[in-house]
């Protein structure tokens, strides 16, 4: 359990949360674990087997404190709100921001800055762990290109230029991604990103993990009360969760790509876990999907330092924190969206 940005996050199975006068009491299997004055909380977010008593739910609804329920995998299930919700004002601000090019450009620029910086951290780590000088030099060159992208980003005045810088950084990155594959490289060779359908094993693996990550970012946006389809970096299209795609950019390399590389390099996944369909599409078999999903959930439990909060939090909570930071900017409670910077 964590309290971040006036939000109580409950993740421990068999947790009971009840209201005792003006104090929220948290018990796990009958043992009192934490007591929090109710006025310290703005919202409560539950994951998995967490029970809130009716008096607490009713009081939160009365006070306009948001309660959000996710399943144990982080999928959004429900929100409990009082009769008059502040979400309508948040969503109005979210839509209004589309006509404010200065605000949307600033948000998009910082999202891309977070993505490129985090990607560069992964590349630099790959260079340090490289088995040979050729791989090390190639990855160091990619890191330099990503640094140039960050420098260009600070001078980019409009959204199209920002998107162009992001796309160029992604091309450099994927051109050398397989340099970080240390075992069975030929079976997991990748030179560029392809999807719908993926045409090689690494792209199939990345697509599956990206789908898991997108689901988490959808849940983060919905849990805060944002419209997942109204984003600022990705182009708006009918049925496309543009905001969730925006949120996930900061986490692609550090969560999804690092996990894919770890699974391959530790031989937890190999070529036998994939099936090639007629036409060249490559799919992951069901057993491997289960193993990958389990590994993904474990990765989300690892703690990382959040630079804005200056404290360690589970990696799986960071998309939820970022969604709340973005909501603060849209409401006017903060001037700038600060992306998550991985260390």
From Swiss-Prot:
- Magnesium: is it a keyword of this entry? yes
Q: Cross-referenced Gene3D superfamilies, in alphabetical order?
A: CRISPR-associated endonuclease Cas1, C-terminal domain (1.20.120.920), CRISPR-associated endonuclease Cas1, N-terminal domain (3.100.10.20)
- Residues annotated as binding Mn(2+) are 166, 234, 249
Q: Does the keyword Magnesium apply?
A: yes
Q: What are the EC numbers?
A: 3.1.-.-
Origin, by domain of life?
Answer: Bacteria
Name of the top EC class for this enzyme:
hydrolase
One molecular function GO term is:
metal ion binding
- Any GO BP: maintenance of CRISPR repeat elements
**Which UniProt keywords are given for this protein, alphabetically ordered?**
Antiviral defense, DNA-binding, Endonuclease, Hydrolase, Magnesium, Manganese, Metal-binding, Nuclease
Name the needed cofactors. Mg(2+); Mn(2+)
Tell me, in a sentence or two, what this protein's role is.
CRISPR (clustered regularly interspaced short palindromic repeat), is an adaptive immune system that provides protection against mobile genetic elements (viruses, transposable elements and conjugative plasmids). CRISPR clusters contain spacers, sequences complementary to antecedent mobile elements, and target invading nucleic acids. CRISPR clusters are transcribed and processed into CRISPR RNA (crRNA). Acts as a dsDNA endonuclease. Involved in the integration of spacer DNA into the CRISPR cassette.
Its assembly, as annotated, is:
Homodimer, forms a heterotetramer with a Cas2 homodimer.
Q: Which family does it belong to?
A: Belongs to the CRISPR-associated endonuclease Cas1 family.
State the HAMAP family in the record.
Cas1
What is this protein called in UniProt? CRISPR-associated endonuclease Cas1 1
- Species lineage: Bacteria, Bacillati, Bacillota, Clostridia, Moorellales
